[in-house]
Amino acid sequence: MANSKTAAEAAIHGQIEKTTAWKDFLALIKMGIVNSNFITTFTGMWLAFYFTGMSFLGNLDIVLLTMIGSSLIIAGSCAINNAFDRDIDILMERTKTRPTVTGKIQPGQAYAFGILLVVLGLIMLLMTTVTSAVIGFIGVFTYAVLYTMWSKRHYTINTVIGSVSGAVPPLIGWTAVTGTIDTTAWVLFMIMFIWQIPHFLSLAIKKTEDYRKAGIPMLPVVYGFEVTKRQIIIWTACLLPLPFFLGGLGWPIVALGTLLNIGWLVIGLMGFKMKDVMKWSTLMFVYSLNYLTIFFVAMIIITLF
């Protein structure tokens, strides 16, 4: 590991990409993750307004505090993750140009900045409801400590543990409005929790060699592709009943969710027939991204009519 890390460091420092401070900042906070969670947080909040009958425009203070606060804690958690993972990020093609790896942002700076963002975000969430702030803290702790610092490097169940943190944004949005969690909020949480596992296992198949080089015990690294495929199918199938608990949004959402789930399951089953595993995992990964966007945006749109 030490020799490979030394070689990687030499290669990286010899070919450091010229980037702006802004680009390094966006890489540090993993802006793609922040953006995707923005959608799910907003959906949870929007549906809370819809089901309670509260005015969206009449509560723009809650909207701004929730969206900015949740984005800050996610960005801060990602910065902490980048700082902690710099020793393994240097070994993977996908992550070797992150600013914490190239030295453009020092670990201490990343930790301090990440903690600052988390604290500011939690304060903003606390200005909405205590419940929202508590859930936000649970998300941060799960991602930064239970996932990043503990399970990621030791257990194949790391994906499941990390999925808890990725599932709390809809709960943050919902509880910022209501202060309580009801069935619809839990369904959004479960959709996000279950969705992440086949999503990230598909990515793990695509990046198996990267994870193997870094010594990260992802499921396909430890148990191979066939076991991973079966796990993907099982978790995808677990999504099937969830749309039926969203009947309050009308049958079109139930139908859309069911079709999306069946489509994903069919593509998953194709993995046992397709010879090109990488092509299949890419198809699964791309479908998962479209699944999330279509389903959550549709939940918002349906309430406008």
From Swiss-Prot:
Pfam families to which the protein is assigned, alphabetical: UbiA
EC number assigned by the record: 2.5.1.141
One GO process term, biological-process aspect: heme O biosynthetic process
Origin superkingdom: Bacteria
Top EC group: transferase
Localization: Cell membrane
This protein's pathway: Porphyrin-containing compound metabolism; heme O biosynthesis; heme O from protoheme: step 1/1
Matches recorded under PANTHER family: PROTOHEME IX FARNESYLTRANSFERASE, MITOCHONDRIAL
Subunit description: Interacts with CtaA.
Function text: Converts heme B (protoheme IX) to heme O by substitution of the vinyl group on carbon 2 of heme B porphyrin ring with a hydroxyethyl farnesyl side group.
Something else known: Carbon 2 of the heme B porphyrin ring is defined according to the Fischer nomenclature.
The protein's name: Protoheme IX farnesyltransferase
Gene: ctaB
